[in-house]
Swiss-Prot record:
Annotated spans, MQO domain: 143-642
Gene Ontology biological process terms from the UniProt entry: tricarboxylic acid cycle
The protein's annotated pathway: Carbohydrate metabolism; tricarboxylic acid cycle; oxaloacetate from (S)-malate (quinone route): step 1/1
Record bears the keyword rRNA-binding: no
Protein name: Probable malate:quinone oxidoreductase
Catalyzed chemical reaction(s): (S)-malate + a quinone = a quinol + oxaloacetate
Source organism (scientific name): Corynebacterium efficiens (strain DSM 44549 / YS-314 / AJ 12310 / JCM 11189 / NBRC 100395)
Disulfide bond positions: none
Cofactor entry: FAD
Source organism superkingdom: Bacteria
Length: 642
């Protein structure tokens, strides 16, 4: 069956078949007198199989989107490619709206030309057209003539980014400013940006800078080790500077949509925890990266700072808190979307609903095989550089690439759940991110905290996370993910960790069997008067903890941080692990640039320093610079005191 659409402002026709289509918004008038099937605006053509796809006029003269696959005058159109109608003419020429290397244009000698239009980014090849490309071709969008050979279609790009989350968004933003002529393509298996780990409901939204997170300051032999806390804080200062620069450049136009001031508080109860909180405070209070840290262990101050946590509390059990007012709550989903909106405006192509299935070496380049999750069609794209920012799926994709650097690495998935407050009165009584001590054997992502969140301008309150276990590597993943990642080269690492981490195993079993009442008991350590009727259980994101190969007798080490993997040539890289994750994305991506593009760093140095003024320096050794940059980022990011 053939469906013919006729745009009211044109004389040309577009023929499409296959898939399941809607006509565009107000863009189609009655059918011509020839025998055709007419589809009214937004009317579904249910005769076509293949799910709910659409055609949208988009308000532009003669433009249609084929969410196919489909046919344009008998010529196969791959899904998500643009098709155009225009007026009848004997000859016509498609020319790009912006003349730049890599644009494709077609000279057409057809009476009815479905390609021409006011803007041509990828011209649909048409019977009678002569295919040409501009000189200095960097990116060719080749289209097949028939469904039979559609899978052989190969695009080319300078950079392919796997995953439309905060990591790919950050790296893409950096590379666009360092090398604006490089073409970038992003593939995302879901139908929108930042819907997995970067989604605000799938993470704590903490701007991790070790202001309150106790797992960054372990106590050894009665002494607090602050080295990890200082390192995390240094990296978060890089994030603040980079984000402030992006705000000034208009890339992140509204900082209040993604970052808000929320005090960070460390909390302990019982004699041992109180002693630890005090020792930690004494170790950090004079450090230049932790200015303004305060401490209290009296009932009056505790009640003033944390009224919700004071209600119903028996203060005969000692308590202590330390805090810094200038903590942050971050919506990484909103931030990712701002980055990616600017990316599309700058020429980056983002293909949602496309899952990367394989990455293979192709000479000095990489061949990336991608599947359209809606139609099942596959395509390949050849890239000079590939970044795998696919969350938990980074491990199996890097394994498929065959690089030596991933040998021996494994992944241990840990899921999470939150209690979300549904009582607006309670939400308004709490204004802090309060972190306590983790249970013995618990992974850092399971450190309990009572969190004020600001999501889409609305204040919320979460408690958790409660850890769980599933073999999935993504929240929207498969139960076969873990088993698919097993290799002869990483079995020793996995078994070694299994023997060593019995405490973690016991902890996860305990967490998995908890019912709602048991979860409420954990909450009541923070909020004694908590009632089950005021809270609901929601599922958080999935994290894959890194298992790193080490020598005998351990064979494997369970890592709770973020690990960057890259090959020796610097042509492919990926990010493994969990916390601190998104908080240090800019620092992680600068490390990637140094590893993979070392020869360009001298050329890029000035631009990187413009984006991150402290680049190459340790702010812990530069207190005056830290103070200056702190004030700059506070003002630019609109972080008034909480």
């Amino acid at each position: 069956m053939i469906v013919v659409f006729r745009h009211e402002s044109t004389i040309g026709h577009v023929f499409l078949t296959g898939g399941d289509y809607h006509s565009g918004a107000g863009g189609f008038s009655r059918a011509p007198s020839t025998a055709v099937t007419y589809v009214a605006p937004w009317l579904r053509t249910s005769q076509f199989p293949g799910g709910d796809r659409g055609l949208s006029g988009g308000g532009q003269r003669g433009r249609l989107w084929a969410y196919g696959p489909g046919y344009v005058e008998g010529i196969y159109v791959p899904p998500y490619q643009q098709a155009y109608t225009t007026e009848l003419r004997t000859t016509c020429t498609c020319t790009p709206s912006r003349s730049r290397p890599g644009q494709v244009f077609t000279t057409c000698r057809s009476a009815i030309h479905p390609c021409a239009g006011p803007r041509v980014d990828s011209c649909v090849q048409h019977a009678g057209c002569v295919r040409q490309t501009t000189r200095g071709d960097k990116r060719k969008l080749n289209m097949s003539d028939s469904p039979k050979n559609a899978q052989k279609v190969t695009d080319e790009a300078d950079v392919v980014l796997v995953g439309a989350g905060i990591m790919s968004a950050t790296l893409g933003a950096m590379l666009r400013q360092l090398e604006p002529s490089w073409s970038q393509v992003i593939f995302e298996r879901l139908d929108g940006a930042a819907q997995e780990s970067s989604s605000p409901w799938n993470n704590a939204g903490t701007g991790h800078s070790a202001l309150c997170e106790l797992n960054y300051t372990p106590e050894k032999n009665g002494k607090i080790d602050i080295s990890k806390a200082v390192n995390i804080n240094e990296k978060f200062q890089v994030s603040r500077q980079f984000w402030a620069h992006q705000v000034e450049e208009g890339i992140l136009p509204d900082p209040k949509e993604f970052i808000n001031a929320v005090p960070h508080v460390s909390f302990g109860h019982g004699a041992d925890q109180v002693a630890y909180i005090k020792n930690r405070y004494n170790a950090l209070k004079d450090h230049p990266l932790f200015p303004g840290m305060q401490y209290a262990d009296d009932e009056e101050t505790f009640t003033e700072k944390l009224p919700l946590m004071a209600q119903g509390r028996d203060f005969s059990d000692p308590v202590a808190i330390s805090w810094i007012q200038e903590g942050t709550d971050i919506n990484y989903g909103s931030q990712s979307k701002q980055f990616l909106k600017a990316a599309e405006a700058g020429g980056t192509e983002i293909r949602y609903g496309h899952e990367v299935k394989d990455i293979t070496k192709d000479g000095a380049k990489w061949k990336v095989t991608v599947k359209n999750v809606h139609t099942g069609d596959t395509q390949t794209i050849r890239a000079n550089f590939v970044f795998v920012g696919a969350g938990g799926m980074a491990l199996p994709l890097l394994q498929k690439s065959g690089i030596a650097e991933i040998r021996g690495f494994g992944g241990f998935p840990v899921s999470g759940q939150w209690l979300r407050c549904t009582n607006e009165e309670l939400i308004e009584q709490h204004a802090a991110k309060v972190y306590g001590k983790a249970s013995v054997g618990a992974p850092p992502m399971s450190v309990p905290h009572l969190d004020t969140r600001v999501i889409d301008g609305e204040k919320g309150l979460l408690f958790g996370p409660y850890a769980g276990w599933t073999p999935k590597f993504l929240k929207e993943g498969s139960n076969l993910d873990l088993f698919s990642s097993l290799r002869p080269t990483n079995l020793a690492s996995l078994l070694g960790v299994g023997v060593q981490e019995m405490g973690l195993t016991k902890y996860l079993i305990t967490e998995v069997v908890k019912d709602m009442e048991a979860r409420m008991e954990s909450l009541r350590e923070y909020m004694p008067n908590a009632k089950k009727s005021d809270w609901e259980l929601i599922t958080a994101g999935q994290r894959v903890q890194v298992i790193k190969p080490v020598g005998a007798p351990r064979f494997g080490s369970l890592e709770f941080g973020t690990t960057l993997i890259s090959n020796s040539e610097g042509t492919i890289a990926g990010l493994l692990g969990a916390s601190p994750g998104a908080s240090i994305a800019p620092a992680a991506m600068i490390e990637l640039l140094e590893r993979c593009f070392g020869k360009r760093m001298i050329e890029w140095g000035d631009k990187i320093q413009e984006m991150v003024p402290s680049y190459g320096k340790k702010l812990a050794d530069e207190p005056e610079m830290f103070a200056e940059l702190w004030e700059y980022t506070q003002k630019t990011l609109k972080l008034e005191k909480a």
